[in-house]
Amino acid sequence: MRKQADLVFQIVSLLTLVVALVALGVLVVDIFNDGASRLSWRFLTNIASRRAEDAGVYHALMGSIWVILLTAALALPIGVAAAIYLEEYGTRSRVARFIELNIANLAAVPSIIYGLLGLGVFVRLLQMGQSVMAGAATLALLALPVVILSTREALRTVPSSIREGSYALGATKWQTIWNQVLPMALPGVLTGLILALSRAIGETAPLITIGALTYIPFAPDSVWSKFTVLPIQIFNWVSRPQAEFKVNAAAAILVLLALLLSMNAIAIVVRDRQQRQGRA
């Protein structure tokens, strides 16, 4: 009876996986068929235009790269520092438990709430305006819970014998964390960062809330420039009544997918290299 139940569970799980992969494959193939004809160097290097055949994604692609790099620069050090405190220093304090509870809740907060927070704090209170910095700071808030939770999980995977051996050699707690624990946890930290950035780069609602532009004829050249990103540009083209702009939107989706896959590929390479160095 148990073997039959296990077999049924395996079959149901396999069918669920196949259905999900087929649905995803159909969507990707459909988008590729619609947008592949528009993909070209000209499409990648042209800026926005009211004529579909002349429009490109350079401004949105550069905006996405600016925003995601700044988001990583903000979320990584803050998230790792918070995780180190919660996991290594504040494990028994009430403050740490309160922070843990709120971080777990923040991971499930709708992204539009982060947009409203960014509008109130970064755009108005700190007077950053509708800039790349305001967008990156807002997305960093969105990414922080994921970075913190994944970093804590990575720190927990480091054997306690590593810490004890370091202490036995006379190292301080911080020296142990910096020289032993963090290098071993780095692959997991990078995985969590890429997951957080992959979510952030596809967000539209928070950036529209803080005032990111749906039409902009130039690429940002500093952190204080106005900007748009690929998801907003895709939304703009999909909203147009002309069929040619739908083709542009499909091509832009392919560019966004390529950007996401590139980020994940870089993370995998770095993670594997760190794991090999850790084994050595």
Sequence positions of predicted segments:
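Interhelical loop and adjacent transmembrane-helix boundary motif
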Residues: 48-55, 207-257
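Transmembrane alpha-helix signature in integral membrane proteins
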Residues: 55-85, 193
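Transmembrane alpha-helices
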Residues: 72, 150-151, 173-211
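Amphipathic cytosolic juxtamembrane alpha-helices at the membrane-cytosol interface
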Residues: 78, 91-95, 100, 163-191
